[in-house]
Amino acid sequence: MASYTVKLITPDGESSIECSDDTYILDAAEEAGLDLPYSCRAGACSTCAGKITAGSVDQSDQSFLDDDQIEAGYVLTCVAYPTSDCTIETHKEEDLY
């Protein structure tokens, strides 16, 4: 099992967390004491949306984002596993529309 450093850029500042490749980024952030937005926790809405600016994730469990949004770097943190060290800007739901 690999572990990666995930840098989260929130409206309140930056935080770096460790996240294993079998843990959703939202879950790891909560375990680290960060308060990120979420609703369904199933990849079926956009409340937890963020934008990845470096690195990569596996969000194959998501069912909300379309191909263009994924291509643009949007990620649903509730169903995203890190596949490398990565940087994600959180609180991006409004930018999807």
UniProtKB/Swiss-Prot annotation:
Belongs to the 2Fe2S plant-type ferredoxin family. NCBIfam families: fdx_plant (TIGR02008). It comes from the Bacteria. [2Fe-2S] cluster binds at C40, C45, C48, C78. Coiled coil: none annotated. Binds 1 [2Fe-2S] cluster. Disulfide bonds join C19-C86. Forms a complex with heterodimeric ferredoxin-thioredoxin reductase (FTR, ftrC) under reducing and oxidizing condition and thioredoxin. Interacts with a number of proteins including RpaA; binding to RpaA is higher when ferredoxin is reduced. This is Ferredoxin-1. Its cofactor is [2Fe-2S] cluster. One of its GO terms (molecular function) is metal ion binding. It comes from Synechocystis sp. (strain ATCC 27184 / PCC 6803 / Kazusa). Ferredoxins are iron-sulfur proteins that transfer electrons in a wide variety of metabolic reactions. One of its GO terms (biological process) is electron transport chain. Pfam families: Fer2. Residues 4-94 form the 2Fe-2S ferredoxin-type domain. Keywords: 2Fe-2S, Disulfide bond, Electron transport, Iron, Iron-sulfur, Metal-binding, Transport.
